[in-house]
A protein has these predicted regions:
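Nucleotide-sugar-dependent glycosyltransferase catalytic domains
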Residues: 1-145, 150-175, 187-190, 282, ...
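A donor-sugar binding/catalytic signature common to diverse glycosyltransferases
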Residues: 3, 198-246
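Short beta->alpha connector loops at strand-helix junctions that form conserved
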Residues: 25-27, 217, 234-238, 256-260
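Nucleotide-activated donor-binding/catalytic signature segment of Leloir-type glycosyltransferases, i.e.
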Residues: 173, 183-201
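Short internal beta-strands
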Residues: 176-180
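Two-component system phosphotransfer/interaction surface
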Residues: 262-277, 297-309
Length: 334
């Protein structure tokens, strides 16, 4: 069995050469659906949602097909894949397990039995974490703060962003924790009692002590905030982050996402006020309770064994080139 994610170049081709099944595991959707667009697309109209998956898949294929065919011919001893066919992992006959909470993003109705949504997977980092005394004392000295941080992502103007963050917290009367990260946030002209600056820290420990969170919208950070029942504002930079921002807003646990190039004082103030609404907190608590009984690791293992094919004659197990996505079929040319 080959286990992989859709972005790993060559996974289906290696499985074909070895004549063994493949199972895809991933943290964002790669299977076509009419319920939401491909996370790497920016399609806004529902009529284009399903097509967006095929287009993204095809664009990836067009960029790597020469390299893949070189691998197939020289290393895997397989015939090359034709110019307009090929796929990076969205074939409906390949089992997929998606690692997110079905209470946040339910399994789409047009996904078949080979697709599973298993729940988030978490590392327990909090149990072995010893917070600095200064942080513990600061947390004890006032109301729960709002966490703001963007991890390792670069910030174009960290001084300006820090100023916006501080002014938004002061305007809304909130204490704040700023994660300096790799973006250089938190260079204050003078220390402020209402602001605590820190470097990387286990989210599963910190978020339990926070009133709300503002972050970039990575799948792991999003999951940690929701598990801690924190209303969430997502400031997406790229990739699947806009997707998670939309899902958080759709679920009622945060405001509409603020793209990083639209980050401004009025928008951050509005986002903080949105998160302070008691109804939003109630929704966050409701979602966190629903997630309590999820075990993504166990769900992933169960999905793996459920989808493990029964042993068949060798002639039946060899992947067929006809199973690969065809761009010509997508546009009705066949």
């Amino acid at each position: 069995m080959v286990t992989s994610n859709p972005t790993k170049i060559g996974h289906t081709h290696v499985a074909e050469a070895l004549k063994i099944p493949i199972h895809i595991f991933f943290t964002m959707p790669w299977t076509p659906t009419t319920e939401f667009p491909h996370p790497l697309s920016r399609v806004k109209q529902q009529a284009g949602y399903r097509l967006s998956y095929q287009i993204v898949d095809s664009l990836i294929w067009l960029g790597i097909r020469d390299m893949i065919n070189d691998l197939r011919k020289k290393k895997l001893k397989l015939r090359p894949v034709t110019y307009l066919s090929g796929s990076q992992g969205s074939e409906t006959d390949i089992p997929h397990a998606y690692i997110w909470s079905p209470h946040l993003v339910p399994k789409p109705k047009d996904w078949g039995p080979k697709i599973d949504v298993v729940g988030f997977c978490f590392l327990d980092l909090a149990s072995n974490y010893e917070p600095p005394e200064s942080l513990v004392k600061w947390l004890e000295d006032g109301d729960k703060p709002i966490y703001i941080g963007f991890g390792s992502l670069p910030v174009q103007d960290p001084k300006k962003m820090t100023q916006i963050i501080v002014e938004a917290l002061e305007t809304t009367g909130q204490r704040g924790i700023i994660n300096k990260g790799w973006g250089g946030l938190g260079n204050l002209t003078e220390p402020k009692d209402s602001i605590y600056l820190l470097d990387n820290i286990p989210h599963d420990w910190l978020f339990l002590h926070c009133k709300a969170v503002v972050h970039h919208g990575g799948a792991g950070t999003t999951a940690a905030g929701l598990k801690a029942a924190c209303p969430t504002t997502i400031v997406p930079f790229f990739g699947d982050q806009p997707f998670w921002g939309e899902r958080v807003h759709d679920r009622g646990v945060g405001p509409p996402p603020i793209p990083v190039d639209e980050f401004s004082l009025p928008k951050l103030i509005d986002a903080i006020n949105f998160m302070l609404d008691p109804k939003v907190k109630d929704h966050a608590i409701e979602l966190a309770k629903a997630m309590e009984n999820e075990d993504g690791v166990t769900g992933a293992v169960k999905a793996f064994f459920k989808q493990l094919p029964q042993k068949k004659p060798e002639s039946d197990t060899e992947p067929s080139s006809s199973k690969f996505f065809s761009l010509s079929k997508c546009f009705g040319c066949s």
